[in-house]
């Protein structure tokens, strides 16, 4: 983490501004004097203010954080003044007269950054023009001067430090915001130094027990680990010196959050982690990086599955480094990162590196890297002009800032950065609108893949096109999974808007009629509310907009429900569930044969389905001979069976499903979704269409996260039916995950 300096505290325990400024490492005397004047101005403006101490110290913290990034003097002055401006102690107009336009513009840009919260707050709601304008201003401020973003990140770190001793709910609130918003933003901009501190503080507040456990493990083995790394580094230095490779070699600290995340992701214990012992090699030149890699792999056996060359294939945020894991002395794993000095600075500072090298001979290279990092933002500003739906614009910003990324290759080897979960059509529309419109197929590594294929990291994709554009309206259906990005959907919407207006009107009428019939509302009644709501003069304009995809159907339906006092979501769900449970479905060719399980070697011994895992036909099964209750039939992957096997392996018997049995089996399916009106109705409609009996439903809502969790006990006849049902449930709008519970 970034350490808080104490050099500015004198012997009497008082703040000494001269010592403080000297501790910041500012080389220009003029800049030091300028910062001293700004500090004096802050003292003057906060005199008598009840929160003077808090505001001043927050500014000091922000300046210290930013000084580790070697930010320029205007950035440091803006950081020192920002807490005062944000608390309305002094207005921007007054500041402009006192400290100048350039510093105030930075402060104004930092205040515009508050709009980033609306990207999370409005994810499932309708959006106002004011919210969209706020986000547009934020994007423009970020592109115009990226220092405002870095200042905002420093302000959030300062806040996390402040709440260390605050009540738990205050710490958790601050940590959740930074986890959801600011840490992903720091990562997207490549500012590793700030990203790690944000993540470690958030992890400490949100998971205090896990944080303390890992911190304790690191501390307990610190001396042994440091001694091991010292010897390992000494050997590498000697070998590279002998080969004439110029590079620094040193052990590097591990961040607690990254350790925990890897333990969770790979289901590893602390002792099984590769990178608790970590070394970094920082070389002078690129060729020295690969020479160093050769030396490492010559003297130590490497693990091929843990090798990544991010120099040849940089991460979407511009990160470059070679990662390898080797078996060191004693068979202990050591993770090694190899990079040039420029790559190291870029990895730690990200966009902030541009300001460090803005002046002088290095400016050109730094500027190029800076431009690469904000290219996605410039595209966002250009794309927003094409997006008629303001909600789509916000969706695209959310995707670019918060979503995980995947990078793939064109046939020529160019890297394309897309949101994780993107499809071949998303790729095609990213390349060019015309490529997407004319797309009829795609190949990954020379193999044809379906349009619903989710692109994987490193895929090389080729788009197959026809002469004439012919996109399908089905591509806009979110349940089918053809197009997942707002960028792609916007391009398709635009194409249909330009086509025959009559076709859009007919399609819109069909869509609207279906929804109105379901709601029990006539078209004339709906017109009176919809025309003014969407600023249309006649119904044909409205229908054309619906058919062309310009109006979001779920928002329109929610609006009509509120206008006509239709049943609440709870009432609709209860009615749908009651109607479904009144029906009982059975397979048409149900067998009367009760030989549901064949257990090898035990004849017709009584058997029953184990409640712990509730296997169904299609699951691989195993029998366990109980005492007095015959044979219990378990799924082969049942955790309880594994326990039984370890204690009494002689009681385990092979079992298979009988060919003629078709009775129903009960199990529990859990659906997690964004809470919305009509969610349970949509889910139960699918179950009814699939003729699945619902035996019970339990649901709960998380109002803070706006999530609904629904556990349904259903009767299923085989694994194929279950797979089909889960597939359709996962395609319901707003459903995040639908799966069979492990114990069912």
Swiss-Prot record:
Gene Ontology molecular functions: ATP binding; GTP binding; GTP diphosphokinase activity; guanosine-3',5'-bis(diphosphate) 3'-diphosphatase activity; kinase activity
What changes when the gene is disrupted? A slight increase in biofilm formation in a csrA-disrupted background; when combined with a spoT disruption (a ppGpp0 mutant) there is a very large increase in biofilm formation. The ppGpp0 mutant makes decreased levels of CsrA and its inhibitory small RNAs (sRNA) CsrB and CsrC. Deletion of relA alone decreases persister cell formation in a hipA7 mutant; the double relA/spoT deletion obviates persister cell formation.
Please identify the protein, giving its name as recorded.
GTP pyrophosphokinase
**Residue ranges of every copy of the TGS domain listed in the record:** 404-465
Q: Which reaction does it catalyse?
A: GTP + ATP = guanosine 3'-diphosphate 5'-triphosphate + AMP
Q: Where's the HD domain? A: 55-160
Q: Spell out the Pfam families in the cross-references.
A: ACT_4, HD_4, RelA_AH_RIS, RelA_SpoT, TGS
The similarity comment for this entry is: Belongs to the RelA/SpoT family.
Q: Where is the signal peptide?
A: none
What Gene Ontology biological process does one annotation of this record name? Answer: guanosine tetraphosphate biosynthetic process
Q: What residues does the ACT domain cover?
A: 668-743
> According to the entry, what is the taxonomic lineage of the organism?
Bacteria, Pseudomonadati, Pseudomonadota, Gammaproteobacteria, Enterobacterales
Q: Which gene encodes it?
A: relA
- InterPro entries assigned to the protein according to its UniProt record, in alphabetical order: ACT-like_dom_sf (IPR045865), ACT_dom (IPR002912), Beta-grasp_dom_sf (IPR012675), HD_domain (IPR006674), NT_sf (IPR043519), RelA/Spo_fam (IPR004811), RelA/SpoT_AH_RIS (IPR045600), RelA_SpoT (IPR007685)
What EC number(s) is this enzyme filed under?
2.7.6.5
Question: Looking at the keywords, is Nucleotide-binding present?
Answer: yes
Q: What does this protein do?
A: In eubacteria ppGpp (guanosine 3'-diphosphate 5'-diphosphate) is a mediator of the stringent response which coordinates a variety of cellular activities in response to changes in nutritional abundance. This enzyme catalyzes the formation of pppGpp which is then hydrolyzed to form ppGpp. The second messengers ppGpp and c-di-GMP together control biofilm formation in response to translational stress; ppGpp represses biofilm formation while c-di-GMP induces it.
């Amino acid at each position: 983490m970034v350490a808080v300096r104490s050099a500015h505290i004198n012997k009497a325990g008082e703040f000494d501004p001269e010592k403080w400024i000297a501790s910041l490492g500012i080389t220009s005397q003029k800049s030091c004097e300028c910062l001293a004047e700004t500090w004096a101005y802050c003292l003057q403006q906060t005199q008598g203010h009840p929160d003077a101490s808090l505001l001043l110290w927050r500014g000091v913290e922000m300046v210290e954080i930013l000084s580790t990034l070697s930010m320029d003097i205007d950035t440091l002055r803006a950081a020192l003044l920002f807490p005062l401006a944000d608390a309305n102690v002094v207005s921007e107009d007054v500041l402009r007269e006192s400290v100048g336009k350039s510093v105030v513009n930075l402060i104004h840009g930092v205040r515009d950054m508050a709009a980033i919260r609306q990207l999370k707050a409005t994810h499932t709601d309708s959006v106002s023009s004011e919210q969209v304008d706020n986000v547009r201003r934020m994007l423009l401020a970020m592109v115009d001067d990226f220092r405002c973003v870095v200042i905002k990140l420093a302000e959030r770190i300062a806040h996390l430090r402040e709440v260390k001793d605050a009540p738990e709910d205050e710490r958790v609130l601050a940590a959740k915001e930074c986890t959801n918003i600011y840490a992903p933003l720091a990562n997207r901009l490549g500012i590793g130094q700030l990203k790690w501190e944000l993540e470690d503080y958030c992890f400490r507040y949100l998971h205090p027990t896990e944080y303390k456990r890992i911190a304790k493990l690191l501390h307990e083995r610190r001396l042994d680990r440091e001694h091991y790394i010292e010897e390992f580094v000494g050997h590498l230095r000697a070998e590279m010196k002998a080969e004439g490779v110029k590079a620094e070699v040193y052990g590097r600290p591990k961040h607690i959050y990254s350790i925990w995340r890897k333990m969770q992701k790979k289901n590893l214990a602390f002792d099984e982690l590769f990178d608790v012992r970590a070394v970094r090699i920082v070389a002078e030149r690129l060729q020295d990086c690969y020479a160093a890699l050769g030396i490492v792999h010559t003297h130590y056996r490497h693990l091929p599955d843990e090798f990544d060359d991010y120099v040849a294939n940089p991460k979407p945020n511009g990160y470059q480094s070679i990662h390898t894991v080797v078996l060191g002395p004693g068979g202990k794993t050591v993770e090694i990162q190899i990079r040039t000095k420029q790559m190291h600075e870029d990895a730690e500072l990200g966009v902030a590196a541009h300001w460090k090298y803005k002046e002088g001979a290095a400016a050109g290279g730094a500027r190029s890297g800076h431009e690469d990092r904000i290219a996605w933002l410039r595209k966002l500003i250009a794309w927003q002009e094409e997006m008629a739906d303001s909600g789509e614009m916000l969706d695209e910003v959310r995707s670019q800032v918060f979503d995980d990324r995947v990078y793939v290759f064109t046939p020529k080897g160019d890297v394309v950065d897309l949101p994780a979960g993107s499809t071949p059509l998303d790729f095609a529309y990213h390349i060019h609108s015309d490529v997407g419109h004319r797309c009829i197929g795609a190949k990954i590594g020379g193999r044809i893949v379906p349009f619903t294929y989710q692109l994987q990291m490193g895929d090389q994709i080729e788009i197959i096109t026809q002469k004439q554009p012919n996109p399908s309206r089905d591509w806009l259906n979110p349940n089918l999974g053809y197009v997942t990005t707002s960028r792609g959907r916007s391009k398709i919407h635009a194409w249909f808007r330009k086509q025959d207006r009559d076709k859009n009107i007919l399609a819109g009428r069909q869509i609207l009629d279906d929804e109105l019939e379901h709601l029990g509302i006539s078209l004339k009644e709906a017109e009176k509310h919809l025309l003014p709501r969407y600023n249309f003069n006649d119904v044909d304009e409205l229908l054309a907009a619906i058919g062309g995809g310009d109006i979001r159907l779920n928002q329109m339906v929610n609006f009509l429900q509120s206008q006509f006092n239709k049943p609440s979501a709870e009432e609709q769900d209860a009615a749908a569930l009651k109607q479904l449970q009144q029906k009982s479905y059975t397979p048409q060719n149900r067998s009367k044969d009760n030989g549901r399980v064949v257990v090898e070697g035990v004849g017709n011994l009584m058997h029953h389905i184990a409640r712990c895992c509730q296997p169904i036909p299609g699951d691989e099964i195993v029998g366990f001979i109980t005492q007095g209750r015959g044979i219990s039939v378990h799924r082969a992957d049942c955790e309880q069976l594994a326990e039984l096997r370890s204690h009494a392996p002689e009681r385990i018997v092979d079992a298979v499903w009988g060919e003629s049995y078709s009775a129903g089996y009960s199990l529990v399916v859990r659906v997690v979704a964004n809470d919305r009106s009509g969610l349970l109705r949509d889910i139960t409609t699918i179950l009814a269409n699939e003729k699945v009996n619902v035996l019970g439903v339990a649901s709960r809502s998380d109002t803070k996260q706006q999530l609904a969790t629904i556990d349904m006990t259903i009767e299923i006849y085989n694994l194929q039916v279950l797979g089909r049902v889960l597939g359709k449930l996962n395609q319901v709008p707003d459903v995040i995950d639908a799966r069979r519970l492990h114990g069912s």
